[in-house]
Amino acid sequence: MRPLVYPFFVLLAMAPALRAADPPVVFEDKFDKTLGSDWAWLRENPKAWRIREGGLEICVEPGLANNVKNALLRSAPDRSKASYAIEVTITFTAPPTNQYEQAGITWYQKGNPVFKLVHEHIDGKDYMIPGKLPAPEKTVRLRLMVTKDKYTAQFQPDAKGEFKTVASGNLAPGDEEQVSIQCYNGPAGVEHWVRFDDFRIREVK
């Protein structure tokens, strides 16, 4: 009997095509030893951020969206030409205690925050905002998907399993778009550090 080798060769022939179909990564930063290229700090406090054990840690300082400290920004991909997913894993290394203490992804237009996908402490409990979906886990992976005029906000509890959609809606195009990872509304006089891991921007179909 002839050995069944044909399917094996078919799979070999298909492998390059399968690899080519993977969504292309536009930018990736593991925060391994240093920050990747083209990041810029907004209101940097050098004493309140660090690269530690293969991740970026930022101390959650008091403040609001309009005066956040140590926000890390970079130019957003051109969503008029394609759709993109922005992902990062965040971990509260200490339980948040302050009302509206939060960390996550913020979208900027012309230097102003216009949208956020965050893990936020509200009335003693932790939620995903927008959507206010309960999220008691200390670690979540965030995914903000953007098209030319819309967004879809998702997260993975414990950075595992399927992504859950918490909200979707319109995100009108604007000038000078940037994407940021940041945290704010921290307690005064107490160090709460948030860890950011595996930041990635990739093109999606």
Q: Where are the regions that the model predicts?
A:
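Positively charged n-region of N-terminal signal peptides that target proteins for export
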Residues: 1-5
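Extracellular glycan-recognition regions
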Residues: 21-205
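Bacterial N-terminal signal peptides
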Residues: 6-15
